[in-house]
């Protein structure tokens, strides 16, 4: 499923091509690209649920204390290793993510059918969430810079 999400993001969203095709047309294209029907349906459902999160009707997205600290469940810790959780905390500290977008990211990560998610894949999920979150264009651009900018020169001598 994650491969399909990446395919859609790279071919439609990130390339700035309008995603105005209907679901049947998109399913046919993804099938021609070699993806299986069941995985296509999972990916499209994942995207639909991401769009639903923007409506703000989830209780965990409505009320929060700015000084609260996120405690991860066992399932979340199994899927997101220490490095990934640290990266989410870093993004909050530098204001790329806020409480709501962090929870959207975690929600979408937990819906992926991968048992664990490596940091590079987490970065793409974050980018997808920020792209779909109205009013977070600046955060999206910052995240895009974090993904695509390569450090110049040597880090260590």
Swiss-Prot record:
Superkingdom field: Bacteria
InterPro entries in UniProt: Smg (IPR007456)
Similarity remark: Belongs to the Smg family.
NCBIfam families, per database record: PRK03430.1
Protein name: Protein Smg homolog
